[in-house]
From Swiss-Prot:
Keywords, sorted A to Z: Disulfide bond, Glycoprotein, Immunoglobulin domain, Repeat, Secreted, Signal
Species of origin: Mus musculus
GO terms under cellular component: extracellular region
Domain Ig-like V-type, first and last residues per copy: 22-126, 127-219, 220-312, 313-415, 416-512
Localization in the cell: Secreted
Residues modified by glycosylation: N44, N89, N192, N369, N381, N389, N485
Signal peptide stretch: 1-18
PANTHER family, alphabetized: ALPHA-1B-GLYCOPROTEIN (PTHR11738:SF184), MHC CLASS I NK CELL RECEPTOR (PTHR11738)
InterPro entries reported for this sequence: A1B_glyco/leuk_Ig-like_rcpt, Ig-like_dom, Ig-like_dom_sf, Ig-like_fold, Ig-like_Receptors_ImmuneReg, Ig_sub
One of the protein's GO biological processes: growth hormone receptor signaling pathway
Full protein name: Alpha-1B-glycoprotein
Length: 512
């Protein structure tokens, strides 16, 4: 896997199972509307589907249901679907997709023969015109005397006039930048903003977009610092650890720090808003927590707030192994109870790590610093997913930072069925044809892969990896075929292999 792909996976940009042959930058085509006349936009309308890489096959989908497919003799970058006059028969929400031709002659699964679905285009045939989409870019906050941000307004119909309004302020703001169906408005003041558009000067404005709230912060928001990979692993030959620092917007410079000390470690930036640090554990004179911060072009005198701290552990396994005990000591534990795992060492003033055996790696799941000779780790509200073999390890907090080998393992066995997540529907009552159905799956532990499953189907309809205990799952383009009962479940990310139960179902009722 490439370094950039690793970083993207770490921060949540994942593909569904079996999608390794899908297109990357060209995987999502663009769809927009071109009226014959902006004076009467619904009198004769054409939808244009464009893709980054040439193809012979284009498909137009209305209200989540197949409508039209064309196969051309030669490869092209776009195709025009003529809808004509818009009536109740051809109004609705449209998306398109394009055929994928692999660079070599190989067999592709059915789903991998198509790009991702395009953006949605709403065609109503009436006024007011459909609302545009609006969002803040690159962040939804500003600082005193700092860089402005944009409110971006996206309209599916080309050639329109864009308008931005601030709540409580008279008048409209005209765009500062404009390109291919998107306009950007520079924002210098906090407030609530919405955009709309006109097809001609005497026309009625469209419905306003959803509100975009721009906040005022006293300083640049902190970046995120995290360990590359799902868990920390300790082994005697390990000399380097990789930390990733990601800013909320493009940065000119990053710093990796321990307390007030800036570490002179060269970093590599795969993107303008992120940097990777390769930390030589042998050269550290302090095992204390790491933080990172950034500063931006034109504002080099102002540093952001520090990230949340990240602690590391390593060990040369030269010191005596600690002893791990469990309270209660029974291997048969009841779900919902609390277990204390006590790690005892022969000396004081150490950093302790609780390890859990994966397949095959032994990884650190908790860390504690102690001024005494022991540390007590707690597992709360335990369930079958906590069953496994645990051990502990420690390291000195003064040079040369020697460490122990792992303790003898302690097995925890929790009774009962696996825990069930909770599936939440983020809509009310019914889902209209062509809309998205967005769910949120609430689990119990972080670092899992969550799946949306439908009654009667084995293959999940959506998959999302998360470093937290919940994830959003969505049906992108709901058609009549999507009606039914849905549940969610989750499985551990490597190196663990546990699986949750199935949530109670949520019914999707499709209207229209």
């Amino acid at each position: 896997m490439s370094l950039l792909a690793t970083v993207l996976l770490l921060w949540g940009f994942t593909l569904g199972p079996g999608n390794t042959l899908m297109l990357d930058s060209g995987s999502e085509p663009k769809l927009w509307a071109e009226p014959q006349s902006l004076l009467e936009p619904w009198a004769n309308l054409t939808l244009v589907c464009a893709v980054d890489l040439p193809t012979k096959v284009f498909e137009l989908i209305q209200n989540g249901w197949f409508l039209s497919q064309v196969r051309l003799e030669t490869q092209v970058l776009s195709y025009r679907f003529s809808l004509g006059a818009i009536t109740s028969n051809n109004s609705g929400i449209y998306r398109c997709r394009c055929g994928v031709e692999p660079p070599v002659d190989i067999h592709l699964p059915a789903l991998n023969k198509w790009t991702m679905l395009s953006n949605a285009v709403e065609v109503t045939g009436k006024e007011p015109l459909p609302r545009p989409l609006a969002h803040a870019d690159p962040v939804d906050w500003i600082t005193p005397g700092g860089l402005p941000v944009y409110v971006m307004c996206q309209v599916a119909m080309r050639g329109v006039t864009y308008l931005l309004r601030q709540e409580g302020v008279d008048g409209v703001q005209k765009p500062d930048v404009q390109h291919k169906g998107t306009a950007g408005f520079l924002i210098y003041k906090p407030g609530n903003y919405s955009c709309s558009y006109l097809t001609h000067a005497a026309g009625e404005p469209s419905e306003p977009s959803d509100i975009v709230t721009i906040k005022m912060y006293a300083s640049q928001a902190p970046p995120t610092l995290c360990l590359m990979g799902n868990y920390l692993m300790i082994y005697p030959q390990k000399t380097y650890e990789t930390l990733a620092c990601k800013a909320p917007r493009n940065a000119a410079e990053f710093q990796l720090r321990q307390g007030g000390k800036v570490l002179k470690i060269h970093g590599f930036s795969p993107t303008r808003d992120a940097i990777l640090y390769y930390v030589n554990l042998k050269e550290l004179d302090n095992p204390g927590p790491f933080t990172c911060r950034y500063r931006m072009h034109k504002y080099m005198h102002v540093w952001s707030e520090d990230s949340k701290p990240v602690e590391l552990m390593w060990s040369d396994e030269t010191l005596q192994a600690p002893v791990l005990t469990a309270e209660p000591s029974s291997r048969d534990l009841e779900p919902g109870s609390t277990v204390q795992l006590r790690c005892t060492a022969p000396v004081s003033g150490l950093r302790f790590g609780l390890q859990r055996q994966g397949k095959p790696e032994l990884v650190v799941v908790q860390m504690l610093n102690s001024s005494g000779t022991e540390a007590v780790f707690e597992l709360h509200n335990i369930s079958t997913i906590d069953s496994g073999n645990y051990s502990c390890i420690y390291m000195e907090q003064a040079p040369p930072f020697s460490g122990s080998s792992s303790s003898e393992p302690v097995e925890l066995r929790v009774n009962g069925p696996p825990p069930k997540p909770r599936l939440e529907a983020l809509w009310k009552s019914t889902v209209h044809l062509g809309q998205e159905a967005i769910f949120r799956c609430h689990g119990h532990v972080p670092r899992v892969s969550m799946e949306l499953v439908r009654e009667g189907f084995k293959t999940p309809f959506a998959v999302a990896s998360t470093r937290s205990t919940s994830a959003y799952l969505k049906l992108l383009f709901v058609g009549p075929q999507h009606a039914g009962n849905y549940s969610c479940r989750y499985t551990a990310l490597p190196p663990f292999t546990f699986e949750s139960g199935i949530s109670d179902p949520v019914e999707v009722i499709v209207e229209g």
